[in-house]
A protein has these predicted regions:
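Acidic catalytic loop of the alpha/beta-hydrolase fold
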Residues: 204-208
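Conserved acidic catalytic loop of the alpha/beta-hydrolase fold
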Residues: 75-93
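Active-site nucleophile elbow and catalytic-triad environment of alpha/beta-hydrolase enzymes
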Residues: 174-189
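Short alpha-helix in the alpha/beta-hydrolase fold that links the catalytic acid
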Residues: 195, 209-218
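Conserved HGGG/HGGXW glycine-rich cap/lid loop of the alpha/beta-hydrolase fold
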Residues: 7-66
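Catalytic active-site module of serine/aspartate enzymes centered on a nucleophile-bearing elbow/loop
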Residues: 223-224, 229-255
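Short beta-strand/loop motif that positions the catalytic acidic residue
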Residues: 193, 199-201
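Flexible "cap/lid" loop of the alpha/beta hydrolase fold
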Residues: 103-111, 115-151
């Protein structure tokens, strides 16, 4: 099981595909893990690995990665990723992130353009909004444990690996705190993203709204988008037959 010591973390990651292939780093969303097909890329990673050297990362506090800092921000997660890219000597990479993972990809495009060849942003925002805040207010771990014990147990199974039992509750609190105040990028920030960007969203996504996607499409100089009809937040999971080929086509055109 590969771990990398970066940014004071024991960061868990896995690799698929040819070792000499062009690197494609896949980032899961909040509460996701490498083996999660809804919050992560588990359903598409193997098909991507037929062509690319795929690196899947578990963010700080998630899955098998620890988080000694006791809090998390998107900048932290961007720094963690940059540290892994440097440690593995990957050079400039293609990044594809779901939800919060998409925000991390945007962060890297802004702060580490030297490491970012393209970004694929699935169901992510450039600025937090009332819909995110309303959902975050429902994510009380103690209430979840009472109302949906099976869901709470599954979340614990995924995120307490190698940690104290019940660590998943603190992770959930950290996710909520981060998303209530971040991200806060302006249109001026978006205009500074120099790499090609593919923006993917379901038309019914209440979090990554079409308004936010339209703003990013308009302001990021080399952006294109894919809006999938009758799809929600986990659009990659609901319609892998649409999202997967489009991601591969986008990366191939920008390699």
């Amino acid at each position: 099981m590969p771990y990398a010591s970066v940014a004071g973390l024991s960061l868990y990651y896995e690799e698929l595909g040819p070792a000499d292939g062009t690197p494609l780093v896949l980032l899961h969303g909040a509460g996701g893990t490498i083996d999660d097909p809804v919050g992560g890329w588990a359903g598409l990673a193997s098909s991507f690995a037929e062509t690319y050297r795929v690196i899947l990362v578990e963010h700080r506090g998630h899955g098998r990665t620890d988080n000694p800092a006791g809090f998390m921000t998107f900048e932290q997660m961007g720094d963690d990723l940059a540290g892994l890219v440097a440690l593995l000597d990957l050079g400039s990479v293609h990044l594809a992130g779901i939800s919060d993972g998409g925000v991390v990809a945007l962060d890297c495009a802004l702060r580490r353009p030297d490491l970012t060849r393209t970004i694929t942003v699935v169901g992510a925002n450039h600025a937090t909004h009332e819909g995110v805040a309303a959902f975050a207010a429902t994510l009380d771990p103690d209430a979840l444990e009472q109302a949906a014990p099976e869901a709470a147990a599954e979340f614990g199974r995924r995120h307490d690996q190698g940690k104290e039992p019940g660590s998943w509750k603190e992770l959930m609190r950290q996710i909520v705190a981060n998303n209530l105040s971040n991200p806060t990028w302006t249109v001026e920030d978006l205009r500074r993203i120099a790499c090609p960007a593919l923006l993917v969203a379901g038309e019914d996504d209440p979090f990554a709204t079409l308004e936010q996607m339209a703003t990013m499409k308009r302001e990021i100089p080399s952006a294109e988008w894919l809006i999938v009809n009758h799809a929600g937040h986990p659009v990659h999971f609901e319609h892998p037959e649409i999202v997967g080929p489009r991601v591969l086509d986008f990366i191939a055109r920008n390699s």
